[in-house]
UniProtKB/Swiss-Prot annotation:
Its EC number is 5.4.99.27. Substrate binds at residues 27, 129, 329. GO terms for molecular function: RNA binding; tRNA pseudouridine(13) synthase activity. Gene3D superfamilies: TruD, catalytic domain (3.30.2350.20), TruD, insertion domain (3.30.2340.10). PROSITE patterns: TRUD, UPF0024. Keywords: Isomerase, tRNA processing. The active site is at residue 80. Responsible for synthesis of pseudouridine from uracil-13 in transfer RNAs. Residues 155-303 form the TRUD domain. Transmembrane segments: none annotated. This is tRNA pseudouridine synthase D. The keyword Phosphoprotein does not apply.
Amino acid sequence: MIEFDNLTYLHGKPQGTGLLKANPEDFVVVEDLGFEPDGEGEHILVRILKNGCNTRFVADALAKFLKIHAREVSFAGQKDKHAVTEQWLCARVPGKEMPDLSAFQLEGCQVLEYVRHKRKLRLGALKGNAFTLVLREVSNRDDVEQRLIDICVKGVPNYFGAQRFGIGGSNLQGALRWAQTNTPVRDRNKRSFWLSAARSALFNQIVAERLKKADVNQVVDGDALQLAGRGSWFVATTEELAELQRRVNDKELMITAALPGSGEWGTQREALAFEQAAVAAETELQALLVREKVEAARRAMLLYPQQLSWNWWDDVTVEIRFWLPAGSFATSVVRELINTTGDYAHIAE
């Protein structure tokens, strides 16, 4: 299995280094739900601004304040502890008057607004995230500048970030131990983290191998293509390759890679043979996903940061802004720009 740091680059390995997250204010994330709260209902959506505390910790504190069970507080996604992040929590408080959440106090956390909503906010139920990053001590401004220009046109590999695999790869290691021993894992969080790490690692491997051996944007017979921004996909045939290639070049269609699991992967013929060969050595992880009935799915191989802009504060400091759809990783953008240094180079987003 290829480690995250050794995955193939789209724009070649960066020539320079830089410091990511010199302080939490250098990594700002604003969650974009993609919908407006209902203004009524048995749930309360709470928009918070936090710094120095993780999402689960804040959710548990909110549950305690509201005197409800922790499972009654949900969120769309985990946000990094070592960053300034704005996100929504959702508390189920039926048949009660609206509580005064301005009285909720937690160090490093501030309630920005709260409003009634009809439905529970479920994991993954967000449109995306807006990022503002500051890279410091950049050693090669010209290289970073050119890479930013190239990323605007060609995007970056849509890798799952190192944080998906846990500190030091602990989640992937747990998945491997589980696969090898077949010992039941009763902790639901561990099961979820480990299965997610296993499938993500296989996806990364497929994308890395495709980058090594071919133009990642070149449609081949049997590729599974999806409309940009959509989840559905269809299979490319030789008769359609020229037209499909034009649509891929226009970013109307995206070539996908497998998220392996049970059931058909989605590709056929040449593309399927390539994907199977790319992860042929990882039989234990594949068997684990099938055994645990994790359904195979597809994910775009390339990621195009939207609204990408940057501003050099000086020759060694650059502020970068962009928006990514849900499930994408800002660190997968940064790794195409610089070799990161610092304690938080690979801490979870």
